[in-house]
């Protein structure tokens, strides 16, 4: 049975916590995963590799993103792959 398909607002699906990173898995399949992350100011993920390309979309504030040796600032409403 397939799960119910319906639109949702990303902003309302994100949960925030003080001094934490909160993650919420939306889809997890062998072909890829969609996970929402909420970072409190100053929180970060350690450098890592992943089996799939990653799309980062900033829905609130801004984020410093490092891809290889390049660093980017991604702001509210922007995305980077």
Predicted feature locations:
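Conserved strand-loop elements at the edges of beta-sheets that form or border functional pockets
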Residues: 28, 39, 49, 57, ...
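Glycine- and acidic-residue-biased ligand/ion/polar-headgroup-sensing regions
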Residues: 52-68
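Short acidic-glycine-tyrosine-enriched beta hairpin
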Residues: 69-81
């Amino acid at each position: 049975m397939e799960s119910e398909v319906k639109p949702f607002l990303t902003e309302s699906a994100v949960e925030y916590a003080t001094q934490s990173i909160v993650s919420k898995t939306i889809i997890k399949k062998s072909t890829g995963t969609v996970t929402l992350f909420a970072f409190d100011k100053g929180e970060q993920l350690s450098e890592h590799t992943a089996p799939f390309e990653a799309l980062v979309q900033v829905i609130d504030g801004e984020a410093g993103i490092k891809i290889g040796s390049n660093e980017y600032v991604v702001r509210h409403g922007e995305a980077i792959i």
